[in-house]
Amino acid sequence: VAALIVALMVVKVGGELAWQSLRELIDTGLDVEDLESIRRVILSISGVKALHLLRTRRVGEQALADVHIIVDDHLSVSEGHQISEMVRAKLIREIASLADVMVHIDTEEDVNVASCAGLPLRDELQKRLDNYFRDIPEARLIEHMTLHYLNGRIDIELLLPQDAVTHSTTARQLAQRFAAAVRNDRDIGNVDVHF
């Protein structure tokens, strides 16, 4: 009888160890309650408008998370990075099972909008703009250009010195000339000129 009891205990412990080992080998995510806790923590961070593509995976007793957060589309890269670091740190601090978190910054709900994947980067776009703006003398005065890749197009912000506006050319006329020059390029959305 004692041998039977010991044998049953060995089978029980062996089964539990086998089940735990099997769970560690199989990718499983966190349960619904943990996912809701993660969502609450993320949405409590200032600057986070929404989140999507939240994925988790258990690695032994700990878990890893991967999430896309949506921030304002005109934030600087460094501010977006700072927000992502705050999200990461707060999640690791407040969700005990999380060992690491990968936070991606998005400026729009990219699962529902046109992709920006095929749009040109700055170098290629700059060549196009040089050609488009060749008949606008004030284009040589551009001090800074900011590109916003949004909804499948590139919105452009140009910064010109105040003296680019002369008595014969108003700021509005100059802005209209820059916008008209790129009107036929399907990759370009809005052109905003600031002085």
Regions found by a protein language model. Give the residues of each.
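Alpha-helical transmembrane segments and adjacent TM-loop junctions that form the membrane-embedded core
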Residues: 1-195
